[in-house]
Amino acid sequence: MGHINRLKEQCDRKILILDGAMGTEIQKYNLTEEDFRGERFADVPGQMKGNNDVLNLTRPDVISDIYRRYLEAGADIISANTFSSQRISQADYHLEDYAREMAYQGARLARIQADQFSTPDKPRFVAGDVGPTNKTCSMSPDVSNPAARDITYDELFDDCCEQIDGLIEGGVDVILIETVFDTLNCKAMIDAAFTMMKKRGVELPVMVSLTVSDLAGRTLSGQTIEAFLASLSPYPIFSVGMNCAFGAPQMKPFIERMGKIAPYYISAHPNAGLPNEMGAYDETPESMAPQIAEFIDEGLVNIIGGCCGTTPDFIARYAQMAEGKKPHVVTQRPQYMWLSGLDLLQVDDHVHAPIDSSRFVNVGERCNVAGSRKFLRLINEKSYEEALGIARKQVADGAAVVDVNMDDGLLDAKAEMVNFLNMIAAEPEIAKVPIMIDSSKWNVITAGLKCCQGKCIVNSISLKEGEEVFVAHAKDVLRYGAACVVMCFDEVGQATTFERRIEIAERAYHILVDQVGMNPLDIIFDPNVLAIATGMEEHDNYAVDFIRATEWITTHLPGAHVSGGVSNLSFSFRGNTYIREAIHSVFLHYAQQKGMDFGIVNAKARMDYHKIPKEQLDIIEDVVLNRRKGAYEDLIELAAEIKEKADAAKAAKAGGATAPKPAAPEWRKDSVENRLKYALRKGISDFLQVDIDEALGKYPHAVNVIEGPLMDGMNEVGELFGEGKMFLPQVVKTARTMKAAVSILQPHIEAEKEGGSSKAGKVVLATVKGDVHDIGKNIVAVVMSCNNYDVVDLGVMVPAEQIVRKAVEEKADAVGLSGLITPSLEEMVHVAQQMQNAGLRLPIMVGGATTSEMHVALKIAPVYDGPVVWVKDASLNAGICARLFGKDGAAYEAELKRRYEQLRQKYHEQQARLGSLQEARENKLNLF
């Protein structure tokens, strides 16, 4: 029996137990720097402590002991200690060349222990743990360049191939891709997993575990859970689930949502609650038991385990509770198409519905250099912001998908596609919808697919170059997790008749479904929309044949969809917009009734079929439906008549008549302060110049505009982000809008300062020694840079001495310390002590998942005379600095000191009221 079937058999009959935290257990051994280094890495520069994966090589006894204790506790699946065993993560420790060996050794040690505990009744499985790395493929690290990337899909894919190859050789039964915060990272890892399995001739189940960044349920890169599942839907993964970020109560609603729609086994391994003020986890196996019982008793999961703060004692308790309980019943695969950007687009199965039905998907056509002269000009001029405005307007006008095409002889289509798609990823109003990647060059399509975390549509593949190329392209579509448009072309040429259209569609369908293994729901046929009313009789039936072919495809090829480039139909009437849109409206009215559910159209220009005058409608229908010979001549006369009226109206306008101006958006009628705040919240920069000019006439100094309405807007954004009402890509876009506003104000500030520096201040940022997590710090850097602060980013694992030295050298105004793991809290105290010893009294801002205001009050503030501020989330740093550096800075410092004194007093009072565990047991209520 293969690995997949073995695990499937177990999941079908019982709830499997996954192990708990590795880092929590390693800390119990009180290992030294020398333990982590061993003799082998004694001379490697930098700190090694905290690199848990290197212990596979230097202290295999410790790692084996932890595996053993989880197996003794009853774990069915143990995770290899390989979370960071890839070059990207190990580069922080100068050990990238040892990453594969760490993966292999971590898996081998787990395999040895699992085999010792396995029995026929209770087989034990080893999961090769693949962590998310501290880099993201979907977001830019550069404030001024939203298209920039710290890492590419290909780089991540290559590193994960090496890691997974080591895991497979080490003997894992499962690949576990966990703590996923960026779906594009996850897709590269899934790609690597299946690539290496194929290379080694094995089939292993792939588990995927998501982490969300807020209670709204979005990933750090902005996707909803539903959009994430759509992105994964083309892959044959074994299970999906969630880990980290939350305790069980916070995670449960998301697991319920996932279980209702995900056609996979469901896993959950929550933290031992949420970190307390000191960064520790207060939950015990006993206190977690009723929380986990809800997952088990309600049939929400197939696999349950623990993440941060959990231990073998937790796992033993979960194993007892799960004994004999029924697992989650896997949901049926959806019978409708899933596409996604940041949000889910669900395309219902074919229903013969009217043209205005939501089942029809408008594909925006204007981001196509071949079809829009304006878009081509903007791309040629590198006017990307204006080009993005075209995409944004299409979505606002009703496009549910945006088509992007960069095929022009004078463009580097691949580079422009990558650049534009990366820029779209930074625009939530556009990125929320799926992208249709449109090119005649296959390398352009694959490059585009590697930029999108959502489930895209490839436009297109065909049998034009033969079956071998068709199959290869289709396999790439599957590999990168997309749907595809299939053109009705084959080796003979383009299908122009009904018979040829259905012949090619049927052949392509069976190759894709039966040979390639593509989900029929992910196939969109384009039976070729061709120009009618050309004066050539053989063209007269093109629209009718398309509509007939649409009905045949949706009837005989189950699940398949139909699309078309609608504007091709009216090509004979280019220059007469009214006639063209009327033809499109009539065509879509009939084609959709027969099952056409996608159309590449100008969504804004869609004409209402029912509002076309009867005498015009009769003529147009005669042409579209080929109801009588010579009808196109009547249409030509109608077109000429309409053009004549349009020309007359144009001439009248030129003679003095003016068209009414479009009504201003409602928010533009508000006060200048509210307009600026709204612009920041929404990331709208179009009106900044006019609004700032007005504000400069109202406020005495340019800096007052920043300190007033602009900072008020940023504070609102921070609050919305903290409440889960905004997500990270929106916050980053807001920060860029703030930067644009500051750049407008900058010359005024410089003039007022008579040439002095116009920067708001200089801030040194660092992830502290022993911690390699830098995504939060990078977000802080982006937001602060956009708020006109000079940011000096020292990177990760920065020793206290270096932070102090740089703060002095750079003449910094503040220091920002970041850390994700519990040991970082102690290191932050050490940094504050070193700054105190150096005579510095600069403000210190601390942030990260384990930090808290209470920890600052109890541990950091008492050892440092300067102000120390706990920053709840990345969007708030700029506002805090503005307060610290402003005229009321001294009052703010005094307020902080009073607040910390109150917190310390409250904490000590609570501790005085708490008895020991033994005292509590002795004083328990005895009811019997």
Regions found by a protein language model. Give the residues of each.
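Domain-level signal for soluble alpha/beta catalytic cores
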Residues: M1-F928
